[in-house]
Amino acid sequence: MATATTMTLDEFLALPETEPPSEFACGRIVEKPMPTWFNSRLAARLAALFEIYFMAHDEGYVNVELRHASREERRAYVPDVSIARWERAPRTASQRREGAIEQTPDIAIEIASPDDRPARIADKLAFYLRAGVPLVWIVDPDERTLTAYTPGRPPTVFGEADTADAAPVLSAFRLPLHDLFSVLDRGLEPGS
């Protein structure tokens, strides 16, 4: 839900953090939906799989719910998971302690939740692509799909039996979607 009062990006960034994190678009605070169990498990699994990859390929780093701000777009979004290459990492300890990173990630990953409106996801996707994010993944836990978006190309939809890659950002990363979505079934009662 958006608040009625408009403000600047600087005013928004000066506010104390909220739980779940708030986002900022069109001069308004936008409450990010509280993640479901499915969303939380998928975000944790994605972060772990990228961390394992980065231990073998020291190309970048993964963050969970890190706010990325764009002054040009006057927006601040909190991807569920974000990836950046090391050459784009904040260079000072104080920059790393600040609440928002004033750059877009190299990969933005959003995990759709039941409370997400399609227009909200479409707005975030358009922002990421306009702001120059080379790869955006939208993960749908209900459909068990991952849709990959890159600027200037049609989206690619991967199903649970497919393997997604992270090109053009990470050329060697491969994600068998069964490995990702299997966390949703662990411990379930049969037939539930």
What positions do the PLM features span?
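Gly/Pro/Ser/Thr-rich low-complexity, intrinsically disordered segments predominantly at protein N-termini
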Residues: 1-192
